[in-house]
C-alpha cells in the first residue's frame, strides 16, 4: 500500500544523507548508547544483568526481563501511551545520527540515573512492591544491528515491552560484534547460550553488575565480583516453553542456531520467530534474485549498500557466503526445523528473501507461518512512534504462540497509514 508521502520523503532524505554502514558503524554504536541512556525504565518489568561463560573464556552479557504484572485490560493503553511518549529510538533517527553526531554530541543531555541498580540505570530490585506473575515461557532474544551494532542496552525498552506484552521471561543476548569478531563468533555465542538454557546450565548470575558498553572489544570479561545469584528464580525452563526470537541480524542468528541445533544434536528448539531476518547473501541490485532489494534498497533507511557492508564486515571469507549458518537461505536441507513464524516488512529490502525462506521451510516442515507487515520498514521494533506496527506484530505473535487462528480484523490494530477498513498484515503462505 502507498506509504505516507511526508514519511517517505523524510526516510528518503535520511537514506541519502547518512553514511554507509561500513563507514559509520563505530559512530552508530556511540549514538545507540546515547539513545539507550535516554530510555525510561519500564515499571512493569524487573530487569537483571547476568553473564554466560563461553569455552574461550569470554563471558557473554545477558539481560533478563521478568514481567511483574499481568497484561490486563487497563494496561494496553497505558503501555502503548508510555511507548509512544518514550524516548524516540526510531530507525530513521538512529540511522542518521552518525552523520551529525560529531556536531551535536556536546549538546545531547544524558539522563542521570536515579536507580540504585547498575550503571545503565537498570535496577535489579525495581518494583519489588508489585506482585510477580508466573511467566508463560522464556524468549531467548537475539538483537539486530547488522552483526556490528545494537546490543542489550539499546534493546532494553523493547525487551521490557516484549516481556510484559507476551507475559514471558525474555533473555536478551549480547553476542560479540563484527568486525572485531567475525563469523562464526556471533552465532557460536548465541548457540552456546541456547544450549546452556536448554540444558538448565545457564548461570544467571551477576545481578546488579554493570555491563561494559565497550565489551565487544574486551578480550575476556568476567562477571562482577559479589554479584547476586538469581538462579533460584530462573529455573531450567520446560524446553517446549522456550522460543528463539530475533530481529534482522538477530533473526539470522536465531535461524542459524536452529540449523546448528539440528545438525549437532545437543538440543532442539521447538519454536522460532524471525522478524525481518537476514537470510540471504546477495544485496547487489544487479545480481540479487529478489526484487525487494531493488525496489526497497535505496529509500527506506536500510539500504542495499548497507546490507552489502554488513555482509562484508561479518564474513571471515568468501566461502562463508554459502555457509547455511551464515546465510540460512543457502541451506540445501531445511527439514526438521522448529515451528516458525516469519514476519517481513513491506518496505524492507529483505522482504522477498524472508518470504522465500518461509516458503522453503513450509515445503519440508509443518506449522510455518509468514505475514507481511503493511507499511513496515526495517527496524520498526525499535521505533517507539510505530505503535501500530508494533501492536500488530505482537497480535500476530500472540496468536502464533497460543496456536489460535489469526482472523482479519478490519479497522482493528491497523497502522496509521492503512486505508480505512484495511488490514495491517498480509498472510503470505
Question: What would you call each of these model-derived segments?
Answer:
Residues 2-4:
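C-terminal auxiliary extensions adjacent to catalytic cores
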Residues 9, 14-18, 35-38, 46-429:
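Alpha/beta-hydrolase superfamily serine-hydrolase fold, recognizing
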Residues 22-35, 40-41:
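Catalytic-loop region of hydrolases
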Amino acid at each position: 500500500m502507498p506509504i505516507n508521502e511526508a514519511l517517505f520523503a523524510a526516510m528518503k532524505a535520511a537514506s541519502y544523507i547518512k553514511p554507509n554502514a561500513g563507514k559509520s558503524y563505530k559512530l552508530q554504536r556511540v549514538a545507540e548508547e546515547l539513545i539507550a541512556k535516554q530510555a525510561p525504565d519500564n515499571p512493569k518489568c524487573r530487569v537483571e544483568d547476568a553473564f554466560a561463560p563461553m569455552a574461550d573464556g569470554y563471558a557473554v552479557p545477558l539481560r533478563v526481563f521478568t514481567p511483574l504484572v499481568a497484561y490486563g485490560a487497563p494496561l494496553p493503553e497505558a503501555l502503548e501511551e508510555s511507548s509512544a511518549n518514550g524516548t524516540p529510538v526510531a530507525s530513521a533517527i538512529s540511522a542518521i545520527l552518525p552523520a551529525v553526531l560529531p556536531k551535536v554530541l556536546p549538546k545531547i543531555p544524558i539522563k542521570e540515573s536515579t536507580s540504585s541498580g547498575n550503571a545503565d540505570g537498570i535496577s535489579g530490585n525495581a518494583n519489588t512492591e508489585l506482585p510477580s506473575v508466573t511467566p508463560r515461557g522464556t524468549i531467548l532474544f537475539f538483537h539486530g544491528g547488522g552483526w556490528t551494532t545494537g546490543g542489550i542496552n539499546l534493546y532494553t525498552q523493547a525487551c521490557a515491552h516484549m516481556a510484559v506484552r507476551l507475559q514471558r521471561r525474555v533473555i536478551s543476548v549480547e553476542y560479540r560484534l563484527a568486525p572485531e569478531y567475525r563469523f562464526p563468533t556471533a552465532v557460536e555465542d548465541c548457540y552456546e547460550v541456547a544450549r546452556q538454557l536448554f540444558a538448565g546450565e545457564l548461570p544467571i548470575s551477576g545481578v546488579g553488575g554493570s555491563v561494559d558498553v565497550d565489551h565487544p572489544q574486551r578480550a575476556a570479561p568476567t562477571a562482577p565480583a559479589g554479584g547476586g545469584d538469581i538462579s533460584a528464580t530462573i529455573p531450567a525452563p520446560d524446553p517446549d516453553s522456550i522460543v528463539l526470537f530475533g530481529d534482522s541480524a538477530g533473526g539470522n542468528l536465531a535461524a542459524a542456531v536452529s540449523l546448528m541445533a539440528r545438525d549437532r544434536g545437543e538440543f532442539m528448539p521447538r519454536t522460532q520467530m524471525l522478524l525481518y531476518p537476514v537470510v540471504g547473501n546477495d544485496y547487489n541490485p544487479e545480481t540479487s534474485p529478489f526484487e525487494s532489494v531493488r525496489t526497497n534498497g535505496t529509500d527506506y533507511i536500510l539500504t542495499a549498500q548497507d546490507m552489502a557492508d554488513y555482509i562484508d564486515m561479518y564474513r571471515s571469507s568468501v566461502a562463508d557466503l554459502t555457509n547455511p549458518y551464515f546465510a540460512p537461505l543457502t541451506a540445501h536441507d531445511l527439514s526438521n526445523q522448529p515451528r516458525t513464524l516469519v514476519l517481513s516488512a513491506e518496505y524492507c529490502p529483505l522482504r522477498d528473501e524472508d518470504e522465500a525462506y518461509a516458503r522453503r521451510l513450509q515445503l519440508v516442515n509443518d506449522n510455518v507461518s509468514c505475514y507481511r507487515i503493511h507499511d513496515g520498514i526495517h527496524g520498526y521494533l525499535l521505533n517507539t512512534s510505530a505503535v501500530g506496527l508494533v501492536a500488530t506484530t505482537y497480535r500476530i505473535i500472540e496468536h502464533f504462540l497460543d496456536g489460535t487462528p489469526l482472523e482479519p480484523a478490519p479497522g482493528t490494530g491497523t497502522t496509521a497509514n492503512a486505508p480505512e477498513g484495511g488490514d495491517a498484515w498480509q498472510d503470505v503462505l
